[in-house]
């Protein structure tokens, strides 16, 4: 589409919750681009990861936005997505809504324009928080199931429209 982009940062390390950056000398726009999915099964107290509505919050210079997965609470959430690439008729829990993905479907990236949030004259501090019920979620592996939330977050600079 003619746009060139440069990746500035990636929050993939499970402990990296903030990123300090300065804006490039010339850019057209800046966006947060995130690919976030929940995986795992079995129950701990929250049964969170694959089947819970975790939220992902971003803060920068007094601004705030968040991403969430509303179909997770719908028992037919993924079944309703068959026309958009979900692989139907698998055994098990394929029809249930999930956190950020459905079986066979490409994971949709979440994109949010933060161009107006960036201060071009100083160091900026982008803060990320992954929450469940308003708090950081720490799974307890009591019954196996390897619950986890995969979060890949980038700050992307666009050089042209």
Identify the residue ranges that each predicted region occupies.
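Residue-level recognition of alpha-helix boundary/capping or hinge positions
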Residues: 15-16, 33, 123-124, 160-161
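Single conserved hydrophobic/aromatic residue that forms the stacking wall/gate
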Residues: 1-11
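Extended extracellular/luminal ectodomain segments enriched in beta-structured repeat modules
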Residues: 23-33
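Beta-strand-rich ligand-recognition modules
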Residues: 38, 48-160
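Surface-exposed coil/turn segments at beta-strand junctions on protein surfaces, enriched
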Residues: 2, 25, 117-121
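Beta-strand acidic-aromatic groove motif in beta-rich domains, primarily in extracellular
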Residues: 43-45
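Extracellular structured ligand-interaction cores
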Residues: 18, 29, 53-55
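Short beta-strands within extracellular/lumenal beta-sheet-rich domains
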Residues: 12-22, 109-112
């Amino acid at each position: 589409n003619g746009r060139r982009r440069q990746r500035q940062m990636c929050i993939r390390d499970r402990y990296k919750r903030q990123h300090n950056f300065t804006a490039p000398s010339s850019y057209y726009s800046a966006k947060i681009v995130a690919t976030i999915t929940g995986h795992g099964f079995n129950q701990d107290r929250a049964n969170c990861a694959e089947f819970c509505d975790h939220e992902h919050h971003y803060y920068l210079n007094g601004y705030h936005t968040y991403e969430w997965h509303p179909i997770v609470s719908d028992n037919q959430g993924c079944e309703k997505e068959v026309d958009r690439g979900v692989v139907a008729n698998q055994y098990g829990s394929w029809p249930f809504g999930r956190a950020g993905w459905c079986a066979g479907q490409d994971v949709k990236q979440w994109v949010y324009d933060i161009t107006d949030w960036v201060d071009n004259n100083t160091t900026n501090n982008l803060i990320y928080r992954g929450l469940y019920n308003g708090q950081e979620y720490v799974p307890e592996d009591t019954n196996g199931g390897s619950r986890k939330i995969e979060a890949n977050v980038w700050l992307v600079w666009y050089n042209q429209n």
